[in-house]
Design a protein with these regions (language model features):
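Bacterial N-terminal signal peptides that target proteins for export
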Residues: 1-18
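Cleavable N-terminal signal peptides
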Residues: 17-22, 29
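Residue-level micro-sites within transmembrane alpha helices that shape
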Residues: 3-5, 102, 243
Length: 335
């Protein structure tokens, strides 16, 4: 436990309220930690497909047992990974929760830069239907650049021979991945509950939450979701729940201003924000129902142009239901 706390060099305890803010401090992957212990780094903690000053787009790093995994690849992830002390070609597998831009916009940069960093071993992208098409389409888009670099890098394998995508069609909770370091379970969450999306060529669009069971602890990533019994059950007894959170009052106020300015009905988007994201109270309810030990907040969804939020009010709402440890995540914070 003490070795894990060394990663929290930037930790700021707020007034005994049980909230910790992870400092945006670069923590080298080679920091003193037992090889068997797991390490989670929040590479990007911003919410929504919005370019922000203080927070990168959603992405998480998990390292355990000599393996390196990514959960989502928002824009800017390659730089964030290097800032966390991890080379791109150390990545063994990628798990995408869903295919919204803020969770996938870094895929092109990762493929290009990882290949040029002398990627030799295959890396697989796993996720909902459409994941395989995303990887293949991105490789096609990079084809011209690959051809230009090929004379200078004749020893590198074809990009299509080292990057692969695999779709998981998860309709009931199940194990989706296992190796010597982790067992991964997935559930379909409620993020697309009101959207009534037509199936694409790849099938039905879905959004997942993931549970990683490891020798030292259990970590669950909600991805984007609203209240969900399936996610509560997935997270039951977890050591760490990494959860999205939304500043719902600020979001609704911004959407109403947009409607007044444009005349375009924003109610469908308001319904999505209310029902398919997690307010502070709903985060607290989920963490309490699941009986998790530590709640880590990320994917802070605020309106465009507004990056601050009332952390005290958020905490008070969470504390109505959850009495465990609460961490307000920052980019590059390690857990």
């Amino acid at each position: 436990m003490q070795s894990k706390l060394k990663f929290l060099a930037g930790l700021l305890l707020l007034g005994g309220a049980g909230v910790a803010s992870l400092g945006a401090e670069t923590v080298p992957a080679s920091a003193q930690q037992a090889p068997a212990a797991s390490r989670v780094v929040l590479l990007g903690t911003g919410g929504g497909p919005i370019a922000r000053i203080g927070r990168s787009q959603p992405a998480n790093l998990l390292q355990v047992g000599g393996k390196t995994y990514l959960i989502d690849i928002g824009d800017g992830m390659p730089r964030q990974l290097v800032r966390a002390g991890v080379p791109l070609n150390a990545v063994d597998a990628v798990f995408l929760t869903h295919l919204h831009f803020d969770h996938t916009a870094g895929v092109m940069g990762f493929l290009a830069l990882d290949w040029q960093a002398r990627r030799r071993e295959p890396v697989h992208f796993y996720g909902p239907p459409g994941t395989r098409a995303l990887v293949m389409d991105t490789l096609r888009a990079l084809g011209s650049g690959e051809a230009i670099f090929r004379p200078q890098l004749p020893d590198l394998p074809a990009m299509a021979s080292v990057f692969f995508g695999k779709d998981w069609d998860v309709t009931t909770p199940r194990e989706v991945y296992r190796d010597g370091a982790v067992t991964v379970r997935a559930v379909e969450n409620s993020h697309y509950g009101t959207m009534h999306l037509d199936p694409g060529e790849h099938g039905v669009n879905r959004s997942y939450s993931y549970r990683f069971d490891m020798a030292d602890r259990v970590v669950v990533f909600t991805g984007d979701t609203g209240p969900s019994v399936a996610v509560e059950q997935l997270a039951r007894g977890a050591d760490v729940l990494v959860s999205e959170i939304i500043d719902i009052d600020a979001i609704i106020a911004g959407l109403k201003r947009r409607q007044q300015a444009t005349g375009v009905d924003q109610q469908p988007l308001i319904d999505h924000m209310v029902q398919e994201h997690l307010t502070p109270e709903n985060v607290g309810r989920m963490a309490a129902a699941a009986g998790v030990k530590t709640l880590v907040l990320t994917h802070f969804a605020t309106p465009p142009g507004k990056e601050d939020f009332d952390s005290a009010a958020m905490l008070a709402a969470i504390r109505k239901h959850f009495s465990g440890r609460v961490v307000f995540g920052e980019d590059l914070g390690a857990i």
